[in-house]
Protein backbone atom coordinates (compact mmCIF):
# COMPACT_ATOMS: atom_id res chain seq x y z
CA UNK A 1 0.00 0.00 0.00
CA UNK A 2 2.82 2.41 0.84
CA UNK A 3 4.48 1.77 -2.52
CA UNK A 4 1.23 2.28 -4.44
CA UNK A 5 0.57 5.53 -2.58
CA UNK A 6 4.08 6.76 -3.35
CA UNK A 7 3.65 5.91 -7.04
CA UNK A 8 0.60 8.15 -7.30
CA UNK A 9 2.76 11.26 -7.11
CA UNK A 10 6.26 9.93 -7.87
CA UNK A 11 7.97 11.77 -10.73
CA UNK A 12 9.96 9.41 -12.95
CA UNK A 13 10.72 12.34 -15.24
CA UNK A 14 11.35 15.99 -14.42
CA UNK A 15 11.94 19.03 -16.61
CA UNK A 16 14.75 21.02 -15.02
CA UNK A 17 15.36 24.27 -16.92
CA UNK A 18 17.09 23.19 -20.13
CA UNK A 19 17.42 19.47 -19.45
CA UNK A 20 15.34 16.43 -18.47
CA UNK A 21 16.03 14.15 -15.52
CA UNK A 22 14.62 10.67 -16.12
CA UNK A 23 14.70 7.78 -13.66
CA UNK A 24 14.79 4.38 -15.34
CA UNK A 25 14.79 0.81 -14.09
CA UNK A 26 18.33 -0.29 -13.30
CA UNK A 27 17.73 -3.86 -14.48
CA UNK A 28 18.18 -7.07 -12.50
CA UNK A 29 18.29 -6.59 -8.73
CA UNK A 30 19.75 -9.23 -6.41
CA UNK A 31 18.11 -9.11 -2.99
CA UNK A 32 19.48 -10.59 0.21
CA UNK A 33 17.15 -10.43 3.21
CA UNK A 34 17.58 -11.20 6.94
CA UNK A 35 15.93 -13.72 9.22
CA UNK A 36 14.68 -11.35 11.90
CA UNK A 37 12.06 -9.51 9.79
CA UNK A 38 11.85 -11.88 6.80
CA UNK A 39 8.49 -11.07 5.20
CA UNK A 40 8.74 -7.36 5.99
CA UNK A 41 12.11 -6.98 4.29
CA UNK A 42 11.23 -9.11 1.28
CA UNK A 43 8.00 -7.21 0.63
CA UNK A 44 9.76 -3.85 0.98
CA UNK A 45 12.42 -4.75 -1.58
CA UNK A 46 10.12 -6.59 -3.99
CA UNK A 47 7.47 -3.85 -4.02
CA UNK A 48 10.10 -1.19 -4.73
CA UNK A 49 11.63 -3.23 -7.56
CA UNK A 50 8.27 -3.87 -9.21
CA UNK A 51 7.36 -0.19 -8.91
CA UNK A 52 10.63 0.79 -10.60
CA UNK A 53 10.19 -1.79 -13.37
CA UNK A 54 13.03 -4.09 -12.31
CA UNK A 55 13.29 -7.86 -12.37
CA UNK A 56 14.71 -9.51 -9.29
CA UNK A 57 16.40 -12.55 -7.79
CA UNK A 58 15.81 -12.78 -4.06
CA UNK A 59 17.71 -14.87 -1.54
CA UNK A 60 16.02 -15.09 1.86
CA UNK A 61 18.01 -16.03 4.93
CA UNK A 62 18.62 -19.76 5.17
CA UNK A 63 17.24 -19.51 8.71
CA UNK A 64 13.80 -18.32 7.51
CA UNK A 65 13.33 -19.79 4.01
CA UNK A 66 9.63 -20.58 4.23
CA UNK A 67 8.61 -16.92 4.18
CA UNK A 68 10.27 -16.64 0.78
CA UNK A 69 8.42 -19.69 -0.50
CA UNK A 70 5.13 -18.26 0.79
CA UNK A 71 5.80 -14.92 -0.91
CA UNK A 72 6.64 -16.71 -4.18
CA UNK A 73 3.30 -18.53 -4.04
CA UNK A 74 1.46 -15.25 -3.39
CA UNK A 75 3.20 -13.52 -6.31
CA UNK A 76 2.48 -16.48 -8.59
CA UNK A 77 -1.21 -16.40 -7.71
CA UNK A 78 -1.26 -12.62 -8.21
CA UNK A 79 -0.24 -13.14 -11.84
CA UNK A 80 3.07 -11.30 -11.96
CA UNK A 81 4.70 -12.08 -15.34
CA UNK A 82 7.05 -15.05 -15.28
CA UNK A 83 10.68 -14.14 -14.77
CA UNK A 84 10.05 -10.87 -12.94
CA UNK A 85 10.30 -12.46 -9.49
CA UNK A 86 12.82 -15.22 -8.91
CA UNK A 87 13.53 -16.98 -5.61
CA UNK A 88 16.73 -18.85 -4.77
CA UNK A 89 17.13 -20.36 -1.31
CA UNK A 90 20.57 -21.18 0.02
CA UNK A 91 23.47 -20.14 2.22
CA UNK A 92 24.79 -16.59 2.10
CA UNK A 93 28.43 -17.48 1.40
CA UNK A 94 27.29 -19.54 -1.60
CA UNK A 95 24.12 -18.06 -3.12
CA UNK A 96 24.70 -14.53 -1.81
CA UNK A 97 28.23 -14.57 -3.17
CA UNK A 98 27.02 -15.83 -6.57
CA UNK A 99 24.50 -12.99 -6.81
CA UNK A 100 27.08 -10.40 -5.78
CA UNK A 101 29.68 -11.64 -8.25
CA UNK A 102 27.35 -12.15 -11.22
CA UNK A 103 27.84 -9.67 -14.10
CA UNK A 104 24.18 -10.27 -15.00
CA UNK A 105 23.01 -8.64 -11.77
CA UNK A 106 22.94 -4.83 -11.99
CA UNK A 107 22.33 -4.03 -8.33
CA UNK A 108 22.44 -5.72 -4.94
CA UNK A 109 20.15 -4.74 -2.08
CA UNK A 110 21.11 -6.34 1.23
CA UNK A 111 19.74 -6.05 4.73
CA UNK A 112 21.89 -7.94 7.20
CA UNK A 113 24.97 -7.91 9.36
CA UNK A 114 27.99 -5.68 8.88
CA UNK A 115 30.04 -8.78 8.14
CA UNK A 116 27.66 -9.82 5.35
CA UNK A 117 27.58 -6.27 3.99
CA UNK A 118 31.36 -6.13 3.71
CA UNK A 119 31.44 -9.48 1.90
CA UNK A 120 28.75 -8.37 -0.56
CA UNK A 121 30.44 -5.04 -1.25
CA UNK A 122 33.77 -6.72 -1.94
CA UNK A 123 32.23 -9.38 -4.18
CA UNK A 124 30.24 -6.75 -6.10
CA UNK A 125 33.17 -4.40 -6.72
CA UNK A 126 34.71 -6.12 -9.79
CA UNK A 127 31.45 -5.77 -11.75
CA UNK A 128 30.92 -2.19 -10.49
CA UNK A 129 27.28 -2.87 -9.67
CA UNK A 130 25.33 -0.63 -7.36
CA UNK A 131 25.05 -1.83 -3.78
CA UNK A 132 22.41 -0.70 -1.29
CA UNK A 133 23.02 -1.78 2.29
CA UNK A 134 21.06 -1.66 5.52
CA UNK A 135 23.38 -3.14 8.12
CA UNK A 136 23.67 -3.49 11.87
CA UNK A 137 24.12 -0.48 14.12
CA UNK A 138 24.28 0.56 17.74
CA UNK A 139 23.19 4.19 17.90
CA UNK A 140 22.69 5.52 21.42
CA UNK A 141 19.27 6.21 22.92
CA UNK A 142 20.05 9.53 24.64
CA UNK A 143 17.72 10.59 27.46
CA UNK A 144 18.24 14.26 28.34
CA UNK A 145 17.61 15.71 31.78
CA UNK A 146 14.48 17.60 30.73
CA UNK A 147 12.82 14.42 29.39
CA UNK A 148 10.16 12.46 31.22
CA UNK A 149 12.61 9.92 32.64
CA UNK A 150 10.02 7.28 33.50
CA UNK A 151 8.33 7.40 30.10
CA UNK A 152 11.58 7.61 28.13
CA UNK A 153 13.31 4.71 29.87
CA UNK A 154 10.23 2.47 30.00
CA UNK A 155 9.52 3.04 26.32
CA UNK A 156 13.15 2.55 25.36
CA UNK A 157 13.50 -0.73 27.23
CA UNK A 158 10.17 -2.03 25.89
CA UNK A 159 11.36 -1.34 22.34
CA UNK A 160 14.48 -3.41 23.03
CA UNK A 161 12.24 -6.45 23.54
CA UNK A 162 10.31 -5.98 20.30
CA UNK A 163 10.49 -9.14 18.16
CA UNK A 164 12.32 -10.87 21.03
CA UNK A 165 15.04 -8.23 20.79
CA UNK A 166 15.88 -9.35 17.26
CA UNK A 167 15.63 -5.89 15.73
CA UNK A 168 18.36 -3.79 14.14
CA UNK A 169 16.68 -0.61 15.42
CA UNK A 170 16.40 -1.81 19.04
CA UNK A 171 17.72 1.07 21.23
CA UNK A 172 19.81 -1.23 23.42
CA UNK A 173 22.44 1.38 24.32
CA UNK A 174 20.87 4.01 26.57
CA UNK A 175 22.69 7.07 27.87
CA UNK A 176 21.35 9.05 30.84
CA UNK A 177 22.94 11.64 33.08
CA UNK A 178 24.59 10.57 36.33
CA UNK A 179 21.79 12.28 38.23
CA UNK A 180 19.18 10.05 36.59
CA UNK A 181 21.23 6.84 36.53
CA UNK A 182 19.77 5.10 39.60
CA UNK A 183 16.22 6.01 38.60
CA UNK A 184 16.79 4.74 35.06
CA UNK A 185 18.13 1.42 36.37
CA UNK A 186 15.10 1.02 38.62
CA UNK A 187 12.67 1.68 35.74
CA UNK A 188 14.54 -0.57 33.31
CA UNK A 189 14.62 -3.40 35.85
CA UNK A 190 10.89 -3.11 36.43
CA UNK A 191 10.06 -3.23 32.70
CA UNK A 192 12.36 -6.21 32.13
CA UNK A 193 10.91 -8.20 35.01
CA UNK A 194 7.36 -7.60 33.76
CA UNK A 195 8.21 -8.84 30.26
CA UNK A 196 7.35 -12.53 30.22
CA UNK A 197 9.11 -15.00 27.93
CA UNK A 198 7.48 -18.22 26.81
CA UNK A 199 5.51 -19.99 24.11
CA UNK A 200 4.75 -17.41 21.38
CA UNK A 201 1.30 -19.00 20.94
CA UNK A 202 0.50 -18.22 24.58
CA UNK A 203 -1.30 -14.87 24.79
CA UNK A 204 0.39 -14.18 28.13
CA UNK A 205 3.87 -14.36 26.61
CA UNK A 206 5.41 -11.07 25.51
CA UNK A 207 8.57 -12.65 24.07
CA UNK A 208 9.11 -15.93 22.26
CA UNK A 209 12.37 -17.83 21.77
CA UNK A 210 15.42 -16.56 19.91
CA UNK A 211 15.32 -17.55 16.23
CA UNK A 212 18.18 -20.04 16.27
CA UNK A 213 20.72 -21.67 18.56
CA UNK A 214 23.72 -19.72 17.26
CA UNK A 215 21.99 -16.40 17.93
CA UNK A 216 20.85 -17.52 21.38
CA UNK A 217 24.40 -18.52 22.28
CA UNK A 218 25.64 -15.14 21.05
CA UNK A 219 23.16 -13.31 23.28
CA UNK A 220 24.18 -15.38 26.31
CA UNK A 221 27.85 -14.77 25.49
CA UNK A 222 27.32 -11.00 25.32
CA UNK A 223 25.54 -11.00 28.69
CA UNK A 224 28.46 -12.88 30.22
CA UNK A 225 30.98 -10.50 28.65
CA UNK A 226 29.12 -7.59 30.23
CA UNK A 227 29.25 -9.26 33.65
CA UNK A 228 32.94 -10.12 33.25
CA UNK A 229 33.72 -6.51 32.33
CA UNK A 230 32.08 -5.19 35.48
CA UNK A 231 28.50 -4.45 34.43
CA UNK A 232 25.79 -4.95 37.04
CA UNK A 233 23.12 -7.48 36.12
CA UNK A 234 19.74 -6.24 37.38
CA UNK A 235 17.35 -8.59 35.53
CA UNK A 236 17.52 -11.88 33.66
CA UNK A 237 20.85 -13.58 33.18
CA UNK A 238 22.55 -16.32 31.22
CA UNK A 239 20.11 -19.08 32.15
CA UNK A 240 17.29 -20.14 29.83
CA UNK A 241 14.12 -18.22 30.86
CA UNK A 242 11.45 -20.25 32.60
CA UNK A 243 8.85 -21.37 30.09
CA UNK A 244 11.27 -21.78 27.19
What would you call each of these model-derived segments?
Residues 7-10, 210:
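Low-complexity, intrinsically disordered/propeptide-like segments
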Residues 9-151:
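Rossmann-like NAD(P) dinucleotide-binding subdomain of oxidoreductase/dehydrogenase enzymes
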Residues 107, 115-244:
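ALDH superfamily catalytic-core signature
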Residues 1-6:
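Long amphipathic alpha-helix in the N-terminal Rossmann-like dinucleotide-binding domain
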